[in-house]
């Protein structure tokens, strides 16, 4: 219980007292989203329409409430901790709204929702939030239990707590004040959580009984209401169907494995408790079959397979390839490709470790048989061939998706970059690199048919790579370069057509070269027309620019008319500004040439008088006695 207090944003203790214990922490974390959550608690939460149908009885849309809350508060991204914090905050607000607090900050007073309190359906919602909070904590611990096995015990404890709250909700709904639909939903909810708990305990019989009960109730509810209301119930039935089949298989129904394999191919695959268990089940089934597998034949040579992990991978190879072909969505295909490549890499690593100890096998060449490698090395080459071929198929599938996106002229979206031919060029570069690695596999150097087959595949992908390089040149109007590349595409494609007679079966899965030839021919015609139009446009632009772009402002060419679009822009060339410099007459300069020839009157008499006055005159001048 104490661990639940670690939830950021408010998580209280376990049990019915969780809402009161989350008071301090919950208010801080819930203020951001508190507006909507407060509105949920100020009115009866869901079931108002049902109240009218069943008179004054209480109604609660249990499945609808939990699905909407989960989608809006973290479970869309698998964030169980966020959803758990939301449940704690909503509990606290419900208790505050209903005045059903668990004491105060100084003293805890435990309270339970009883049948006498059922005057408002929010009391039922309070118990539902208790169960949801415990369930979300269990799912959070399940994510962490992969790295910390000790947390599995805590996970089971939280699931038991969730079942306890669900049973309490079911008991309250048995009251005459609650309508029949809510009673059925409470029973289905309890059966669902109980089934999950039994599933974790590997009590398959009890789990399948609980899941079947849940499925039956939801199917009955779906058939009793309109199609819009039945969508949620049908979704829940689809969610628990894989769990039912898994339990049936563990009880002894061997036919269930085929249905589980088909469920894995559906969009999104399986989720929750079943995802990891289903992968483990498939591996376990293949391991049982691997005991009968002792050898594998590839390109006319049979080699023994003694490594169990390699046997399991080779047994599932055909199933994996069929699953990729049958996949409904691109996301599922990509997930299956990645899973297959991961298994193949693991098998190659095991074989590589077996090759290290034996020095003779590290030399790869058997004495007396040049060009022939050991069985273990040949098996390594076979697994590498599978890995590279799968990588080529995955990249080819991605290239097809990008080609479809290029053909669909979608509006520009700033948030998402539209695909470009350069993206396809990169994919085909990777494919060609994988083909080069295939040619270098040990043990296949003398296989002329294999070398020829890979050479033809290389020509096919080179043709497509050249085609998209030409497309990228067309986008930047480099017509001559694009035309040369189109001719190169036709050259590669014609070589494939001339040499593909004996390899049609191996090339049937590759892109159609004849279709590429037709497309290139049409593109060449379009390119030549576009080049001619572009040349005419360039000539007209040069002619008009020679008439207009002569650096003359409008004020100097009033006498000639030219359509100049720049005149209506902010950089219109109307006048020279600032004006240019022009020569003007300067101010005349006068020189006094007669000054040197003028004789001025003598001043000696005045200078003598000033000299005679001396000190006496100076003193008189100071005191003002000078006349």
Swiss-Prot record:
Chief localization: cytoplasm
Region: Disordered, residue numbers: 1-53
Ranges of compositional bias, category Basic and acidic residues: 34-43
Required for interaction with SRP72: annotated segments: 588-610
One GO-annotated biological process of the protein: response to xenobiotic stimulus
Keyword tags: Acetylation, Cytoplasm, Endoplasmic reticulum, Nucleus, Phosphoprotein, Ribonucleoprotein, RNA-binding, Signal recognition particle
Region (RNA-binding): 52-252
Domain of life assignment: Eukaryota
Compositional bias per record (Gly residues), positions renumbered to this chain: 8-33
Record carries keyword Iron: no
Listed InterPro entries: SRP68 (IPR026258), SRP68-RBD (IPR034652), SRP68_N_sf (IPR038253)
Modified residues (Phosphoserine): 48, 241
Family designation: Belongs to the SRP68 family.
UniProt xrefs under PANTHER family: SIGNAL RECOGNITION PARTICLE 68 KDA PROTEIN (PTHR12860), SIGNAL RECOGNITION PARTICLE SUBUNIT SRP68 (PTHR12860:SF0)
Assembly mode: Heterodimer with SRP72. SRP68/SRP72 heterodimer formation is stabilized by the presence of 7SL RNA. Component of a signal recognition particle (SRP) complex that consists of a 7SL RNA molecule of 300 nucleotides and six protein subunits: SRP72, SRP68, SRP54, SRP19, SRP14 and SRP9. Within the SRP complex, interacts (via C-terminus) with SRP72 (via N-terminus).
Notes concerning its domains: The N-terminus is required for RNA-binding.
Protein's recorded name: Signal recognition particle subunit SRP68
Organism: Homo sapiens
């Amino acid at each position: 219980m104490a661990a639940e207090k670690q939830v950021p944003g408010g998580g209280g203790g376990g049990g019915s007292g969780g809402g009161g214990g989350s008071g301090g922490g919950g208010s801080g974390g819930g203020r951001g989203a508190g507006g909507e959550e407060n509105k949920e608690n100020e009115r009866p939460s869901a079931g108002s329409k049902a109240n009218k149908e069943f008179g004054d009885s209480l109604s609660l849309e249990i499945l609808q409430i939990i699905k909407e809350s989960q989608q809006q508060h973290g479970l869309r991204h698998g964030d169980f901790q966020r959803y758990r914090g939301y449940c704690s905050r909503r509990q606290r607000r419900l208790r505050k709204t209903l005045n059903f607090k668990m004491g105060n900050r100084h003293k805890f007073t435990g309270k339970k929702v009883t049948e006498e309190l059922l005057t408002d359906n929010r009391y039922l919602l309070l118990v539902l939030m208790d169960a949801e909070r415990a369930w979300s904590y269990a799912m959070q611990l399940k994510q962490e239990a992969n790295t910390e096995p000790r947390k599995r015990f805590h996970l089971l404890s939280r699931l038991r707590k969730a079942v306890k709250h669900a049973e309490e909700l079911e008991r309250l709904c048995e009251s005459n004040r609650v309508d029949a639909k809510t009673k059925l939903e409470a029973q289905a909810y309890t059966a669902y959580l109980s089934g999950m708990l039994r599933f974790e305990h590997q009590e398959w019989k009890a789990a399948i009984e609980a899941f079947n009960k849940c499925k039956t109730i939801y199917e009955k509810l779906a058939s009793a209401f309109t199609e819009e209301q039945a969508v949620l119930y049908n979704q829940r039935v689809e969610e628990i169907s894989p769990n039912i089949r898994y339990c049936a298989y563990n009880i002894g129904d061997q036919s269930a494995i085929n249905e589980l394999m088909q469920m894995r191919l559906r969009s999104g695959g399986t989720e929750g408790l079943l995802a990891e268990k289903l992968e483990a089940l498939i591996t376990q089934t293949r391991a049982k079959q691997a005991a009968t597998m002792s050898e594998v034949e590839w390109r006319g040579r049979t080699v023994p397979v003694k490594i169990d992990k390699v046997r399991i991978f080779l047994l599932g190879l055909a199933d994996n390839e069929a699953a990729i072909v049958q996949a409904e969505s691109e996301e599922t295909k990509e997930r299956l490709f990645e899973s297959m490549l991961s298994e193949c890499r693991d098998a190659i690593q095991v074989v590589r470790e077996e090759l290290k100890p034996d020095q003779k096998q590290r030399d790869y060449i058997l004495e007396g048989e040049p060009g022939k490698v050991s069985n273990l090395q040949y098996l390594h080459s076979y697994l590498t061939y599978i890995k590279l071929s799968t990588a080529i198929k995955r990249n080819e599938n991605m290239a097809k998706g990008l080609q479809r996106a290029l053909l669909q002229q979608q509006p520009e979206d700033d948030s998402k970059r539209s695909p470009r031919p350069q993206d396809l060029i990169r994919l085909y570069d990777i494919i060609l690199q994988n083909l080069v690695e295939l040619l270098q596999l040990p043990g296949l150097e003398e296989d002329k048919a294999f070398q020829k087959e890979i050479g033809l595949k290389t020509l096919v992908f080179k043709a497509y790579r050249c085609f998209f390089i030409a497309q990228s040149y067309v986008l930047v109007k480099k017509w001559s370069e694009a035309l040369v590349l189109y001719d190169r595409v036709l050259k590669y494609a014609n070589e494939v057509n001339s040499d593909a007679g004996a390899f049609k079966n191996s090339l049937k899965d590759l892109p159609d070269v004849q279709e590429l030839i037709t497309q290139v021919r049409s593109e060449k015609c379009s390119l030549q027309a576009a080049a001619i139009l572009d040349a005419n446009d360039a000539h007209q632009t040069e002619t008009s620019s020679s008439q207009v772009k002569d650096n003359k402002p409008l004020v100097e060419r009033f006498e000639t008319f030219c359509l100049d679009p720049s005149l209506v822009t902010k950089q219109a060339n109307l006048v020279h500004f600032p004006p240019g410099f022009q020569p003007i007459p300067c101010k005349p300069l006068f020189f006094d040439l007669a000054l040197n020839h003028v004789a001025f009157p003598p001043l000696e008499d005045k200078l003598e008088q000033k000299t005679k006055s001396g000190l006496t005159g100076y003193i008189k001048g100071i005191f003002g006695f000078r006349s």
